[in-house]
């Protein structure tokens, strides 16, 4: 999970984020679809945007290559060979669009896949979709976001956070009365609840 869709509620809204070492650009296109791109120009790799905002297109500050909200290259000004011929034209322009990161939305959340996987988002979520359907996650909004920086491997931290088995032993003076067996379940696809 990358973010909530509400981070880019309107056409032209964008939000830059670093996720697992990748600099990403979340954008809502003219078709109202949320897309995620590598936040780098395809020419020399300059960052396209910083922070959050709204725009009609993405323009690289270095050579002014300009992209649509759908990531397609609009123009690469004066990008010619020694004879003055355009190196990018209608026949190859689509090869120079922004690098789109595979993404999908569900329940108001934006998910990305940075690695190789053959499952679709729906397949990956499995029975989780039905289990949470009654909560109407797509209608919820983030009221407060808290970010913790820690000197730890995030996977170890999350594993400990979802591991309720240790609570009666490690937290015996504070949380031991909580019946963790009533709450903790491991579901298919590795989802914890």
Feature roles, as predicted:
Residues 1-6:
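Extracytoplasmic c-type cytochrome modules immediately beyond a signal peptide or single-pass transmembrane anchor
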Residues 8-116, 123-126:
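Rieske [2Fe-2S] iron-sulfur-binding domain
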Residues 33, 104-105, 109-193:
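C-terminal catalytic domain of Rieske-type non-heme iron oxygenases
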């Amino acid at each position: 999970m990358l973010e909530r869709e509400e981070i880019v509620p309107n056409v032209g809204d964008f939000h830059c984020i670093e996720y697992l070492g990748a600099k990403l650009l979340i954008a809502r296109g003219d078709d109202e679809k949320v897309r995620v791109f590598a936040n780098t120009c395809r020419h020399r790799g300059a960052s396209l945007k910083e922070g959050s905002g709204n725009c009609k297109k993405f323009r690289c500050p270095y050579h002014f290559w300009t992209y649509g909200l759908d990531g397609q290259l609009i123009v690469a000004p004066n990008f010619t060979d020694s004879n003055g011929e355009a190196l990018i034209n209608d026949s190859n322009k689509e090869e120079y669009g922004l690098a789109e990161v595979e993404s999908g939305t569900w329940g108001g959340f934006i998910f990305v896949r940075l690695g190789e996987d053959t499952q679709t988002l729906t397949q990956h979520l499995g029975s989780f979709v039905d289990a949470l359907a009654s909560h109407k996650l797509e209608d919820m909004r983030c009221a407060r976001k808290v970010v913790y920086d820690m000197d730890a491997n995030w996977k170890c931290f999350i594993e400990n956070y979802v591991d309720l088995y240790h609570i009666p032993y490690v937290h015996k003076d504070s949380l031991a009365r909580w019946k963790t067996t009533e709450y903790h379940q491991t579901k298919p696809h590795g989802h914890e609840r």
